[in-house]
């Protein structure tokens, strides 16, 4: 039991020194903060995937993967003639609203 507590304290100390000790916890100033950040980021991604659907989430990932420090994913897709179907980005709520107009 003491080793678990000691390990937790060691991780917390490393986090306080600015090291990321939890995957997805970047920016947290303590072990607990990093755990909360990682959980929120994971949950946010899952929620977004549910909103967009698998195809939309995949298309958005393709576009984001093309981005660089100099150019957005949209600019690179246009330059390299890569087709990104943004109609798949629409959430279920947006589609319902557009149909009612």
UniProtKB/Swiss-Prot annotation:
Region Disordered, annotated ranges: 1-101
Pfam families membership: LEA_5
Family: Belongs to the small hydrophilic plant seed protein family.
Start-end of Polar residues biased regions: 90-101
PANTHER family: EM-LIKE PROTEIN GEA1
Basic and acidic residues composition bias: residue spans: 7-17, 38-62, 71-89
Induction: Down-regulated by drought in 30 days after fertilization seeds. Not regulated by drought in leaves, cotyledons, hypocotyls and roots.
Gene name as annotated: SLE3
Cross-referenced InterPro entries: LEA_5, Sm_Hydphi_plant_seed_CS, Small_hydrophilic_seed_prot
GO biological process, one term: response to abscisic acid
Tissue expression as described in the entry: In seeds, expressed in the embryonic axis and in the cotyledons. Not detected in leaves, stems or roots.
Name the record gives this protein: Protein SLE3
């Amino acid at each position: 039991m003491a080793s678990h507590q000691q390990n937790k304290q060691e991780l917390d100390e490393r986090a306080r020194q600015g090291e990321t000790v939890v995957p997805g916890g970047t920016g947290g100033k303590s072990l607990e903060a990093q755990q909360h950040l990682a959980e929120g980021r994971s949950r946010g991604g899952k929620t977004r995937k549910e909103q967009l659907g698998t195809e939309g989430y995949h298309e958005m990932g393709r576009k984001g993967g093309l981005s660089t420090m100099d150019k957005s994913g949209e600019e690179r897709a246009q330059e390299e003639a890569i087709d990104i179907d943004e109609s798949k980005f629409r959430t279920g709520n947006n589609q319902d609203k557009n149909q009612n107009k």
